[in-house]
Amino acid sequence: MTAAPWDAIVLGADSNGLVTAHYLARAGRRVLVVDPRQEPDARVDVGWVPPQIIRELKIDARTSGVEQSDPWIAAPLAGGGRLELWRDVAKSADAIRKVSPADAGKWAEFCTRMRRLAGVLEALYVEAAPDIETRQIGELLHLGRVGLHVRRLGKQTMIDLIRILPMSIAELLDDWFENDTLKGILGAAGVWHLRQGPRAAGTAFNFLHHHAGSPAGVFRPPWSKLTQTLATMPGVEIRRGTAATIVARGGRATGVRVGNEEISATLVVSSADPRTTFEHLKPQLDAEFVRAVGNIKMRACVVRGAWRGNGSRVPLCVAPSLDYLEHAYDDAKYGRPSAQPYVEAMGTEIHVQYAATVDAGLAARVATALGVSSDQVTLEPANGHLYHGDLTLDQILFMRPVPGWSRYRTPIHGLYLCGPGTHPGGGIAGAAGRNAARVILKET
């Protein structure tokens, strides 16, 4: 065994892995990050970055930020033209008024109420998942703070929260609006990275989850360069192009194996998905835990790619109605890429939903949806679940990744999880990494 004085080895140089690594390093730990990719990911991070991360890691917000587009979304209208929604609530209402005066009149109130509900989730997301069986004073105080936050928002917000979280996004939007294009834009946020249709229960929660960190009236996650920024900050060593497996003996993680080399560490932190993390550790795990991890719903449904685009930075949403989204899901439900896929395009990048696999004609169908020729679209091979598990009501908070193990620790002593497969899930950049680091520092 190679003697290496690492206090921690972090597997994965994504936003969560790097956030965990830098928190540990700032606490005086010697940290090695191991990542199988040869080059850093040049893509922007999609999702809210809690301000605590920027402040506590002393990140320059000017270099880690990305200019957000305005309008924040555009969608083609059936009769020609586009519906554009802006960061200014009143300006969006003016745009909506051209297609539905009734919807325009409700827009401001809808935005205000959704922002309040997303604020409740934000309060939950910057802490480890609540332990509902706890008797520890610190945990009880955290639960009390969240409850007080909700109470201060008023009776209507508490009613909205209890009523809306289990609803389908279609039910929520049908309560408020009549225009199909508007409901298609908003409904798409409710099924983002879910192999479910807009009429599935709990998709209203997914809608609010992706509203976290965004201003009122903006229902897509913000962008940042968090991963790129952390990768260049001093304090941790990053080894790229290196695939590692976790080494555990006697129920304790002792390091990782890279090729023929074994690197020792006091603890190991994995930002990989739970199934991958535990794949080689099953003989040391309880059968019930192995079963629970194997049953995590990780139904990949998104393919990414590129198109030549039109030079616009304004994201284009092709989801003309809730029915369109539901029919697109119907294909995926039976394992087929959608005949009419839900597509979002921003700059040169495209996001194709309900396409866990890429068939010969998918690129052409995506091109048709975008109104371009098929030679202008290139799709990447499907590559697993970006969120490391569906964000459904049975896989959030203290049930993520599995019930009983929501606090980033695992049955293997000295092995922790910090990826989006843990609370609060994907689409919240770095939050799981920060929460995991705080638990690790408290326990070790």
PLM regions and their residue ranges:
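Active-site/ligand-binding neighborhood in enzyme catalytic cores
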Residues: 115-233, 241, 392-395
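A short, glycine/Asx- and small/polar-enriched loop/turn
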Residues: 79, 195-201, 247-254, 348
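Structural core of flavin- and non-heme-iron oxidoreductases
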Residues: 1-32, 36-39, 96-98, 102, ...
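Mid-domain catalytic core of redox enzymes
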Residues: 213-219, 236, 242-347
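A conserved FAD-binding loop/helix module that cradles the flavin
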Residues: 420-441
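N-terminal glycine-rich phosphate/pyrophosphate-binding loop and immediately adjacent elements
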Residues: 2-133
